[in-house]
């Protein structure tokens, strides 16, 4: 995992952003959370995370997006954290609470530079949003991105006790192994808030709702009118909300919730 400082001014607080698959810092480096250092994490070919950088901060606030919603609770310790999820699940592959298995397998097996561009187009709400995204699109090597998706699948299936046959089909473990996985899943660090988009075309809305059902009441799950990649929502989550008085923050949550 890469950890890149965007702002490092020895502030007492850190905003730690876990980006999605195929991302880097390019689309997110324009944001400036008030009174905080700001670090972006990406490239989940490994989930190794240098926790020593957290020791200098009084408070660490975590925003996780897309595949980062799965990676963040694995990487970070439980202390001093406020965790916010956006358009992702802690079960990255799953027919009921993640990206449907066939969709994930088809994306991986058919991945080309052209299909990657189609994926990025699907992340965006409309053609104008996609055009704006192209100006700040990640600058990573395609082969590295493909390897990242392969290793995400490998890591997740190993964690869950799933084997993959020669045709790419998932073979699930026996009941004892599944029970062990479920128990481990529920020991994840719980998110404090989750924002999910009605126009998300990567993670199905109902799957995200199911994923967060066990964590908290409905007032902590915000269903917003946004796409998978949504620049106004990122501006709120990575910048504006951190300078809001609490009453304004809660009022804005009510406005966002559809």
Specify the residue positions occupied by each region the protein language model found.
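Gly/Ala-rich beta-loop-alpha elbow adjacent to hydrolase catalytic centers
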Residues: 63-68, 72
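Short beta-strand/loop motif that positions the catalytic acidic residue
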Residues: 194-196
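Conserved alpha/beta-hydrolase catalytic His-Asp/Glu region
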Residues: 114-156
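Flexible "cap/lid" loop of the alpha/beta hydrolase fold
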Residues: 80-110, 138
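Conserved alpha/beta-hydrolase "acid-adjacent" motif
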Residues: 201-207
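Acidic beta-to-alpha connecting loop that harbors the catalytic carboxylate
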Residues: 198-201, 225-227
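Conserved HGGG/HGGXW glycine-rich cap/lid loop of the alpha/beta-hydrolase fold
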Residues: 2-48
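Catalytic histidine-centered segment of alpha/beta-hydrolase-like enzymes
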Residues: 223-241
